[in-house]
């Protein structure tokens, strides 16, 4: 039986109603109590390393998640990260590169509704994440609404619907329905990595993201040059010389 660690970070999945609206309050043991049926599929334990609204996620906290996985890498067969949806895709992409060549599965999930809500998607999403972590396929994934998405290609596209995430420029890796996994045979991944030499839980936050638009003032690049180590350009897909000009 596989040994899986749930790493709780907060988010809607751990929220409860208060006078100030939804606030992260449920601890990791409470999350585990909502999916008792999973106990027959694996040995599941949990740890809470933060309890935040994911809009407050930042590179340092992302590194804390990676460091936690590195700390427990020899004790568990797979990892599930409970996370808020607003910044889940950022954390997933960051973990893909910080955990490069990591030989165990890391599955990130969350929900559109709190675990305690009547029609919550939290129970299914968390269950699906654990089920896929038990598969033992190395890599970082997002589990949401029955879809398993490569962590580097997940993007939130809806704010209210259960199918909040899509896979961008890459096929969905697998689907889960009634606890059964259907793998996408078109996806050929390196699922059998054998070492952890690629774990580097470090990020450089001195990077600016700029969305190019017609008429952008080039002075902004002079500012970036003096204050940042790098710049990512969000530009049109064509023509290619648009960004170069």
Model-predicted segments: where are they?
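Gly/Ser/Thr-rich loops at beta-strand to alpha-helix junctions
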Residues: 11-13, 84-89, 147-149, 240
């Amino acid at each position: 039986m596989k040994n899986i660690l749930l790493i709780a970070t907060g988010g809607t999945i751990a929220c409860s109603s208060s006078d100030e609206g939804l606030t992260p309050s449920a601890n990791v043991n409470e999350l585990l109590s909502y999916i008792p049926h999973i106990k027959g599929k694996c040995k599941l334990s949990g740890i809470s390393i933060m309890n935040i609204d994911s809009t407050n996620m930042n590179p340092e906290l992302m590194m804390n998640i990676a460091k936690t996985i590195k700390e427990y890498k020899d004790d568990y067969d797979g990892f599930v990260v409970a996370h808020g949806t607003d910044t889940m895709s950022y954390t997933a992409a960051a973990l893909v590169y910080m955990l490069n060549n990591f030989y165990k599965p890391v599955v990130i999930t969350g929900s559109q509704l709190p675990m305690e809500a009547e029609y919550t998607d939290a129970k299914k999403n968390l269950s699906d994440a654990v089920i896929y972590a038990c598969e033992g396929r190395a890599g970082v994934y997002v589990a949401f609404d029955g879809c398993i998405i490569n962590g580097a290609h997940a993007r939130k596209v809806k704010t209210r619907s259960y199918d909040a995430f899509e896979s961008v420029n890459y096929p969905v890796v697998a689907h889960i329905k009634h606890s059964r996994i259907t793998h996408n045979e078109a996806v050929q991944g390196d699922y059998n990595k054998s070492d952890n030499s690629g774990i580097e839980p470090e990020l450089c936050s001195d990077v600016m993201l700029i969305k190019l638009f017609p008429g952008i003032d080039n002075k902004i690049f002079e500012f970036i040059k003096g204050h940042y180590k790098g710049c990512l350009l969000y530009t049109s897909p064509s023509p290619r010389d648009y960004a170069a000009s």
